[in-house]
Amino acid sequence: MGKDQTIDKSGHPAEDTRSNHAASSAQVRRAAAVFAGTAAALLILCAVLTVIVDPFFHYHAPLKGFPYVVDNQLSQNPGMARNMTYDSIITGSSMTVNFNTNDFREAMGVNALKLSSNGAYPKDIANVLDFAYDEHSKARKASPLTNAFIAIDVAVFTAGPEEVKYPQPTYLYDKSPLNDIPYLLNKDVLLQYVLRPIVEREATDLATVYATTWQTEEYFGKDWVLQGFVPSEVREKEEPKDAYREKTEINLERNILSYVRQHPETEFTFFFPPYSILYWYNVERENHLEATMAQYEQIGETLLKEDNVRVFYFQDMEDVVTDLANYSDYEHYSPAINSYMAACFGTGEHEVHPGGMHEVLDHMRSIVDSFDFETFLAPQ
């Protein structure tokens, strides 16, 4: 050992210690670089797979033969509306989920796409119409939108005109690629919508997309419905007859009629879904029967002023709405009812013509007034 060589505290030459430290640092840097490179490669692979498959149809139409899983209305409706081939849409709340588009083809010869939006507020319906009418989309370049079938749930027409039911993934609602990272680098999208379908090979049938196919016979009937039914609290003060008029008018104008008037090429078919008689039981207990009846008449007659509008009223089908065998809860009906309504759109049965809302609502009122709720709800 040279006389000038320094020794560190461990007894090793200081130069060896510095050399080992430098080598160790180089190894750490190499490992970090390898890790970063691997991570970047995996992220790029994830993004590339997502773009190629595009399970939310954000960039292109479905790949032929890929078994797409479609079960996310908020994320998949925008891309479906823009990039699939169809000439008609079905939209609205969960009252539309059990429609089968094959029934529409059989009844009217239309190629319909179902774009249900559970709990849809008027603004949610407007958003779907925005996607469907995008003139730059593959869908609209292929054909005009000739029909729109829309469920009207009057209760939500008191919502704010810009209010939506659920927070929206806005990066899927615009066309900017700059904010698509939450889609392209999304673990759930990759695993559940890209890789899982490849393994399971069980594609969603778009004819029945979003349908509650898990609801078998035991989920329907009086016993099942009543065990989950909670009657509304009784309110002593009655709502004024015009309580809902102003908010309803605003929603009609901004979120519905603006599209009807801008698109005379489309025939709009609006329908009032057949909730069970228990819906009206709650309306009476909440003491807004007159206000609700007035709201129905306002919406129906306002829509019927437009030349390209048809209106159907299904709520006064007494044999249906008073038989809970048709229902899974106090509002939601079986797919057989959806099939019947689709057939009616073709035949015109239950269609209301201008000035006709008062008559069907009088019939509905007579059903409610004469129904023996006490006996119906009594324990068996």
Language-model segments: residues:
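Alpha-helical transmembrane signal-anchor/signal-peptide segments
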Residues: 52-74
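Short extracytoplasmic
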Residues: 68-95
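Membrane-embedded segments
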Residues: 91, 95-183
